Amino acid sequence: MKDELNKVVVYTDGACSGNPGPGGWGAVLLFDNGEKTICGGHPNTTNNRMELTAVVQALKFLDVTYVIDLYTDSVYVKSGITSWIKKWKINGWRTADKLPVKNLELWLELDKIVKYHKITWYWVKAHSGNLYNEKADMLARSQIVK
């Protein structure tokens, strides 16, 4: 009988004070046997970079292949990984406006990491009372160095 893959639910968020400015990211990983939180920050960044970093760091934390339900409140992240990235690759990592894709190194890293997992991507409305999205937001905000 085939082994069933490990499952995890992940909530990520990024925050920035000013854009650009100091920022933070946070992730809540919900395993069958408990919860793990991770977070970090950067002194000069953007909100989109922190949103993307949260997802990359959460996926890098996982040391084996998982079936993942991943929740983000970032349309940039969800649309980027589920839709835009296909065209960016075809266009030599350029946007529809022929401009270089911003945060390219993070998109390249995410593109590589997602191949190791079976991820279903979800968008969740920010600040709408979702417990784990709020927790990820709190973690991200806690890392903003002022």
Swiss-Prot record:
Location of this chain's protein in the cell: Cytoplasm
Record: residues binding Mg(2+) 2: D13, D137
Keywords: Cytoplasm, Endonuclease, Hydrolase, Magnesium, Metal-binding, Nuclease
Cofactor requirement: Mg(2+)
Gene3D superfamilies recorded: Ribonuclease H-like superfamily/Ribonuclease H
Gene Ontology molecular function: magnesium ion binding; nucleic acid binding; RNA-DNA hybrid ribonuclease activity
EC number(s) recorded for this UniProt protein: 3.1.26.4
Major enzyme class: hydrolase
GO CC, one annotated term: cytoplasm
InterPro entries: RNase_H (IPR050092), RNaseH-like_sf (IPR012337), RNaseH_domain (IPR002156), RNaseH_sf (IPR036397), RNaseHI (IPR022892)
GO biological process: DNA replication, removal of RNA primer
Function: Endonuclease that specifically degrades the RNA of RNA-DNA hybrids.
Name the UniProt record assigns to this protein: Ribonuclease H
